[in-house]
A protein has these predicted regions:
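MFS 12-TM fold signature
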Residues: 79-84, 103, 168-172
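Extracellular/periplasmic helix-loop-helix junction of adjacent transmembrane segments
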Residues: 20-54
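Residue-level signature of mid-helix packing/kink "hotspots" within the transmembrane helices
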Residues: 13, 49-58, 142-143
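Juxtamembrane intracellular "pre-TM" segments in multi-pass secondary transporters
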Residues: 181-195
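Conserved MFS/SLC helix-loop-helix module at the cytosolic interface between two early adjacent transmembrane helices
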Residues: 55-91
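Helix-loop-helix hairpin linking two adjacent transmembrane segments in secondary transporters
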Residues: 95, 124-129, 133-181
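Extracytoplasmic
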Residues: 3-28
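Cytoplasmic helix-loop-helix junction between adjacent transmembrane helices
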Residues: 93, 99-137
Length: 195
């Protein structure tokens, strides 16, 4: 679970250090006219990811409550693998922007459901340690992963950072499948908006 939160930290924040590289590559006409405008336009990749988080967190968490948590976590980590791999291969700014929005969708649900899974795995008296363990991946990502991803992206092309992130999520998917215990869903649980 912490491996996935490490990947989430990387995919969310590595873009910031690579905006000039991304803008130069996928917005060449804008870059030729104004580098500042190209970087500002590339900044939409950050905004669209954040929008995906806002839309996806409550939607996915609500829908996923009915299904076994280990399967939901596998699905979320798989989605993060695929959407980051798409960012690596897609040729145009518009398609990359769409992949960034899609990559943001599982973000909040991964943290929310992952924290519940970790708390259940450790049981009473150690639930907070389980939640902290999941969030440790995010902390380590901000200290190690993002600078490393930015360095790799600047040295070998910005896309390498996203295939690295996709690889991290692939590893997270495998470890979740192997080590997260089965937990039944709650078929009766739904989201309601009372007001």
């Amino acid at each position: 679970l912490a491996i996935g939160s490490f990947g989430i930290g990387m995919t969310e924040f590595v873009v910031m250090g690579l905006l000039p590289d991304i803008a130069r590559d996928v917005l060449p006409a804008v870059w030729a006219h104004s580098q500042d405008d190209a970087i500002a336009q590339a900044g939409w990749l950050i905004t669209l990811y954040a929008l995906g988080v806002v839309v996806g967190a409550p939607t996915i968490a609500g829908i996923a409550a009915r299904f076994p948590r280990h399967l939901v976590m596998i699905a979320l980590a798989t989605a993060l693998t695929v959407f980051n791999a798409l960012t690596f291969v897609l040729p145009s700014f518009e398609l990359i922007a769409a992949s960034r929005f899609l990559a943001g969708l599982p973000h909040g649900a991964y943290f929310g459901i992952g924290a519940l899974v970790a708390a259940d795995m450790l049981g009473p008296g150690k639930r907070a340690q389980g939640v902290a363990f999941v969030l440790t991946g995010l902390t380590i990502s901000n200290v190690v992963g993002v600078p490393l991803g930015t360095f790799l992206g600047q040295q070998y092309g910005w896309r390498i950072a996203f295939i690295a992130v996709a690889s991290i999520f692939a590893l997270a998917t495998i470890t979740i499948a192997l080590f997260v215990p089965k937990h039944p869903g709650d078929p009766g649980r739904t989201i309601t908006l009372e007001g």
